[in-house]
Amino acid sequence: MATMYYEQNINEEVLKGKKIAIIGYGSQGHAHALNLKESGFDVVVGVRPGGSFDAAKADGVDVKTVAEAAQEADVIQILLPDERQKAVYEAEIAPHLEAGKALMFAHGFNIHFGQITPPADVDVFLVAPKGPGHLVRRQFQEGAGVPGLFAIHQDATGQAKDLALAYGKGIGAARGGLLETTFKEETETDLFGEQAVLCGGATQLVKAGFETLVEAGYQPELAYFETLHELKLIVDLMFEGGMATMRYSVSDTAEWGDYVAGPRIIDESVKARMKDVLTDIQDGTFARRWIQENENGRPEYTKFKEAGANHQIEEVGAKLREMMPFINEGKEKVVREVATSAKN
């Protein structure tokens, strides 16, 4: 059974008196920085001059260049996109990693796949809320918290675990619970979930269903409603109470169809290919391909992105969403929450 840690189990004093550098001020960066600041920790944000620099300054956070923040901080949390971390680390962070400092991440990609190799005399750990930054911020402001993961890669000082837990408490994650894992487990399961189910699996399933109905002569608008629009209703039910709650909530006809048709779509051959995807993640094949893609200027990434944007389902969906203002209101609410949370 997984070990969970909550606020009452954690002493944050180990992190008090230390300066924490948040590198990056995007969705996660602004949430971590502001939550830590309001929890009484000494925070500095390290970003390049420009929009994020000005935004952090306007929020009342101490802002420096990445190199300056890394130099003066005791704990350095890198909240940049995976593909940018190595270059920024080597140029602006590594020169200032003195013995006894701590290097943090919110995802284990660059450590696990050897893109970043910190010196042996620094602590290395991750703390990863399981939700987007605007939700991490909103839950914190409401007195709740998004649950998170933490893992230790190096414990040079003997305090790495205590520091990770204190950091998790500072951003509000310990209110929801912090689950202990490893860099390997966090990285591989996160990538697998994205590729096989949450992003890759879901988008291909929706697209195939939409195309099947349209090619059979049904109106694209109805196909969109039945394969994409209503997906949120089903996922919300599963999110709230698991598959059993979803099946309880839908009609008996829908539930019966789930049982008899579902295994015809997602059968053992699909599971076998999922295992192939997992193997590519575990042996580094996916990581090497993604690293090479970035080094080459992202030609395949751009091609895939353009093809997806030009699919008929996007055109149909855009027109239908214009007829449903409540959807745009929800989208605008998220944007407002991000802006408001950064101001408060």
From Swiss-Prot:
Which is one Gene Ontology cellular component term of this protein? cytosol
Q: Where on this chain does Mg(2+) 1 bind?
A: 190, 194
Q: Which organism is it from?
A: Lysinibacillus sphaericus (strain C3-41)
State any single GO MF term: NADP binding
User: What residues does substrate bind to?
Assistant: 251
Q: Which domain of life is it from?
A: Bacteria
Q: Name one GO biological process term.
A: L-valine biosynthetic process
Major enzyme class: oxidoreductase
- Give the catalytic activity: (2R)-2,3-dihydroxy-3-methylbutanoate + NADP(+) = (2S)-2-acetolactate + NADPH + H(+); (2R,3R)-2,3-dihydroxy-3-methylpentanoate + NADP(+) = (S)-2-ethyl-2-hydroxy-3-oxobutanoate + NADPH + H(+)
* Known role: Involved in the biosynthesis of branched-chain amino acids (BCAA). Catalyzes an alkyl-migration followed by a ketol-acid reduction of (S)-2-acetolactate (S2AL) to yield (R)-2,3-dihydroxy-isovalerate. In the isomerase reaction, S2AL is rearranged via a Mg-dependent methyl migration to produce 3-hydroxy-3-methyl-2-ketobutyrate (HMKB). In the reductase reaction, this 2-ketoacid undergoes a metal-dependent reduction by NADPH to yield (R)-2,3-dihydroxy-isovalerate.
Query: Keywords, A to Z?
Result: Amino-acid biosynthesis, Branched-chain amino acid biosynthesis, Magnesium, Metal-binding, NADP, Oxidoreductase
Q: Outline the extent of the KARI N-terminal Rossmann domain.
A: 1-181
Report the residue ranges that make up the KARI C-terminal knotted domain in this protein.
182-327
Q: Which PROSITE patterns match?
A: KARI_C, KARI_N
Instruction: Write out the pathway annotation from the protein's UniProt entry.
Output: Amino-acid biosynthesis; L-isoleucine biosynthesis; L-isoleucine from 2-oxobutanoate: step 2/4; Amino-acid biosynthesis; L-valine biosynthesis; L-valine from pyruvate: step 2/4
Signal peptide range equals none
Q: Which cofactor does it need?
A: Mg(2+)
Does the record carry NADP as a key word? Answer: yes
Chain sites annotated for binding Mg(2+) 2: 190, 226, 230
According to the record, cofactor stoichiometry and binding are noted as: Binds 2 magnesium ions per subunit.
According to the entry, what is the taxonomic lineage of the organism?
Bacteria, Bacillati, Bacillota, Bacilli, Bacillales
Q: Which residues bind NADP(+)?
A: 25-28, 48, 52, 82-85, 133
Q: Which family does it belong to?
A: Belongs to the ketol-acid reductoisomerase family.
Q: Spell out the protein name for this chain.
A: Ketol-acid reductoisomerase (NADP(+))
- One Pfam family cited in the UniProt record for this chain: KARI_C
Q: Catalytic residues per the record?
A: 107
Q: What is its EC number?
A: 1.1.1.86
Gene symbol here is: ilvC
